[in-house]
UniProtKB/Swiss-Prot annotation:
SUPFAM superfamilies recorded: Scorpion toxin-like
Main location class: secreted
GO molecular function per UniProt: ion channel inhibitor activity; potassium channel regulator activity; toxin activity
Function: Blocks human voltage-gated potassium channel Kv1.2/KCNA2 (IC(50)=3.6 nM) and Kv1.3/KCNA3 (IC(50)=72 nM).
Identification of the protein by name: Potassium channel toxin alpha-KTx 10.4
Localization per record: Secreted
SS bonds (residue pairs): C3-C22, C8-C27, C12-C29
Site (Basic residue of the functional dyad): K21
Matches recorded under PROSITE patterns: SCORP_SHORT_TOXIN
Note in the entry: Negative results: does not block voltage-gated potassium channel Kv1.1/KCNA1, intermediate conductance calcium-activated potassium channel KCa3.1/KCNN4 or the Shaker IR (with inactivation domain removed).
Family: Belongs to the short scorpion toxin superfamily. Potassium channel inhibitor family. Alpha-KTx 10 subfamily.
Domain remarks in the Swiss-Prot or TrEMBL record: Has the structural arrangement of an alpha-helix connected to antiparallel beta-sheets by disulfide bonds (CS-alpha/beta).
Length: 33
């Protein structure tokens, strides 16, 4: 699957995380910026 930054970030925020980033084409959620 291709990680799209905007989608990843929005998905992470909806799950209560601070932000999301694409690492090795995978979405990673972070509790901090």
């Amino acid at each position: 699957a291709v990680c799209v930054y905007r989608t990843c970030d929005k998905d992470c925020k909806r799950r209560g995380y601070r932000s999301g980033k694409c690492i090795n084409n995978a979405c990673k959620c972070y509790p901090y910026a």
